[in-house]
Amino acid sequence: MTRSSNQLTDAHLRPDPSDIHRLLAGEHHDPHSVLGAHEYPGHTVIRAFRPHAVKVTAVIGGERHVMQHLESGLFAVAVPFTNLIDYRLEIDYPGVGDAVVTHTTADAYRFLPTLGELDLHLFAEGRHERLWEILGAHRRTFTTADGPVSGVSFAVWAPNAKGVSLIGEFNHWGGNDAPMRVLGSSGVWELFWPGFPPDGLYKFRVHGADGSVTDRADPMAFATEVPPHTASRVTESTYEWHDEDWMTRRASLNPVFEPMSTLEVHLLSWRPGLTYRQLATELTEYVVEQGFTHVEMLPVAEHPFGGSWGYQVTSYYAPTSRLGTPDDFRYLVDALHQAGIGVIVDWVPAHFPKDAWALGRFDGTALYEHSDPRRGEQLDWGTYVFDFGRPEVRNFLVANALYWLQEFHIDGLRVDAVASMLYLDYSRPEGGWTPNQYGGRENLEAVQFLQEMNATVHKVAPGIVTVAEESTSWPGVTRPTNLGGLGFSMKWNMGWMNDTLAYISRDPIYRSYHHHEMTFSMLYAYSENYVLPISHDEVVHGKGTLWSRMPGGDHEKAAGLRSLLAYQWAHPGKQLLFMGQEFGQRAEWSEERGLDWYQLDEQSFSTGVQNLVRDLNAIYRSRPALWSRDTSPEGYSWIDANDSANNVLSFLRFGNDGSMLACVINFAGSEHSQYRLGLPHAGTWREVLNTDADIYNGSGIGNYGAVEATDEPWHGRPASAVMVLPPLSMLWFEPA
């Protein structure tokens, strides 16, 4: 800093009138060119925009220079220095009565941008894999001549906005007194605000291209207010992970060839009132006790409407604050990992809600959504559809997937509503959609996005799983991207689910006429890598529950449910079961109340179903025949697929280790007391599972723990055994 001997002049105090007009209107693209310190020959002019201040003083070293109020909160002073390195602003605000409240701060408009050219270039090309590190709100400390300056830097993408200002508790949510600057042609607006509270609330006041002025939550917010409040919150993780063993093991395995038995959970209603940290104890203990390998959480990203179950996301980078902080959510994931449980979260890149404070028409234009409503709106759900062809939007979503996998150690993403992304005419009337460049109905931009997302996450986070909820016959959903597929690890088998639930809902006396519904799935079982889903979608909106779908009285319902679950666990594919169904909840699920845990208060049919699921998981995990060849035809062989007269199905499962299981299920309401089953060889076959056993509150009918196979050929097999098949039951056997 150099003191000048030149005569000071007020000639440069007042900026150009157009600058003042745009500044006051909140529509200045570069407020830093007006505010802050600006050097002229022999002196420096410092300007500050503090509309609520009664006095502003520039403090330089030990000198105080009172600033002149020009107009409407714009203050300026000329000081006799050049090469000015540092200064502070002393701002007087009116207090109670005649009191004055003085606030001293570094000047926000003297700091250089916090984003580099490379970051902006990568973002513009849609290739910044750690986008959350440059956009959003970040605590920072800068070293200055007058000491360290701590605050928060803010950056938001709004390329068509006329102006963007930071608002929050720090300025009483008002005005345009914290205008941000746009960085070149990037469309990114940026500002570092000294002294911003480390957990402060904020929004962006966006002056849109359409003349609108809206207060917006940060699209990259890492934390939010608790809904229904909508502000974003500054946060910074201090969490120390303790799941190193899990993460190392994860990176070395391919989940397609590992056991996967998943409990799908809606965290807010599993046991209402629990926080993330309380769930870390109670949910973890329960899942371990029941023997599941994974938990799949309905969307945890922040959403304003609880009735959406999390599927209408407004803050893609923030775990819902209803249950705690982001670090509390990390604690939950960590606890599950330390207990040996994988964590999958539902992820919703297909669409987003139209709330005026969120992503929709963010800068007064269709920014995140497609500009053509025939592609940019999802009519069924009243939501916007992302513009998958826009590089910055694609980057926002791909980086978001990486964010959950890397910052929260999530093990997998279940991608919601993939079919709605793949087809331009999805749920649209004739004339209500536009074809692709080749005249087809395929959304080629969405295909490219899904391929890029899958290729990127599997490269960056080896061992994770991506699962598609895709309800059509789109080819190659789980085929690698280098072979033209979408690149998902697995896909929900919606056909199996629909056929199976239709079949088991029928009275046993009619099932023989629909036998094909239970065999059809094996015709395509190896066309994709499948998950067998009995999800939340099957226990809402009047569909009832698995229990209520079963025909008959309570005894028959319990037996039917037990046999269904055993059939699911024995069928090729990974398992997914929505919470409550593992103990036969009778009431349909609602997000507004908890599960009916009272059904387990005494020995009951529910206790029996729960005991069965625990044993299914234990047997499943310990028998490679049930999972190691899920994607290979060599892992399965029918014994008899055609015994419709008896409502019986039987098959063999084979493991990579040479193990095998013989599985036979009786869907009839009556016992088959002398049923002969073909087997690969003679000898003793141990009864590994009988869903009608006493421990499951069944009737106790069985084969005393084993059957003896003789060399009498049957079902095209060289040996066979005669056994008892209880009504509505499934039996598993293995060589003794």
Swiss-Prot record:
Gene Ontology MF term list: 1,4-alpha-glucan branching enzyme activity; cation binding; hydrolase activity, hydrolyzing O-glycosyl compounds
GO cellular component: cytosol
UniProt enzyme class: transferase
Catalytic activity reported: Transfers a segment of a (1->4)-alpha-D-glucan chain to a primary hydroxy group in a similar glucan chain
Residue positions of the active site: 416, 469
EC number, UniProt record: 2.4.1.18
Lineage: superkingdom: Bacteria
UniProt pathway annotation: Glycan biosynthesis; glycogen biosynthesis
Keywords: Carbohydrate metabolism, Glycogen biosynthesis, Glycogen metabolism, Glycosyltransferase, Transferase
InterPro entries: A-amylase/branching_C, Branching_enzy, GlgB, GlgB_N, GlgB_N_E_set_prok, Glyco_hydro_13_cat_dom, Glyco_hydro_13_N, Glyco_hydro_b
Gene ablation phenotype (knockout): Cells lacking this gene display maltose 1-phosphate (M1P) accumulation and trehalose sensitivity. These phenotypes are suppressed in mutants lacking both glgE and treS or both glgE and mak.
GO biological process, one term: glycogen biosynthetic process
UniProt subunit comment: Monomer.
Function according to Swiss-Prot or TrEMBL: Catalyzes the formation of the alpha-1,6-glucosidic linkages in glycogen by scission of a 1,4-alpha-linked oligosaccharide from growing alpha-1,4-glucan chains and the subsequent attachment of the oligosaccharide to the alpha-1,6 position.
Family membership: Belongs to the glycosyl hydrolase 13 family. GlgB subfamily.
Record-given protein name: 1,4-alpha-glucan branching enzyme GlgB
Organism: Mycolicibacterium smegmatis (strain ATCC 700084 / mc(2)155)
Name of the encoding gene: glgB
